């Protein structure tokens, strides 16, 4: 599979509409064409309706849209914890790992 981290709205729009004008876009296009897992982590906020429509188009095409939302309920000790959580979520979405490490799982505490 392929992960695009971060994904600008330009990249999101290009992939959503089948444009492949550079190596990154071509890799995403081939990933979709071959039915492989594509994970995109959009980096921009706020989103307007065109952004949301492009993300919906990608989702309907099988792309995993994974917003980089920090898991504050895990009580991160710093930026490394926040980054580690997002990286592990991407690896999980790609199928590289089967579960989040126990220190990154919510236990209700």
Protein language model features and the residues they cover:
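Glycine-rich phosphate/pyrophosphate-binding loop and the adjoining helix
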Residues: 64, 69-109
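Phosphate-binding/catalytic loops
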Residues: 38-51, 63-77
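Helix-loop-strand module that forms the ligand-binding subsite of alpha/beta enzymes
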Residues: 1-53, 58
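Short, hinge-like loop/turn segments at secondary-structure boundaries
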Residues: 55-59, 82-85
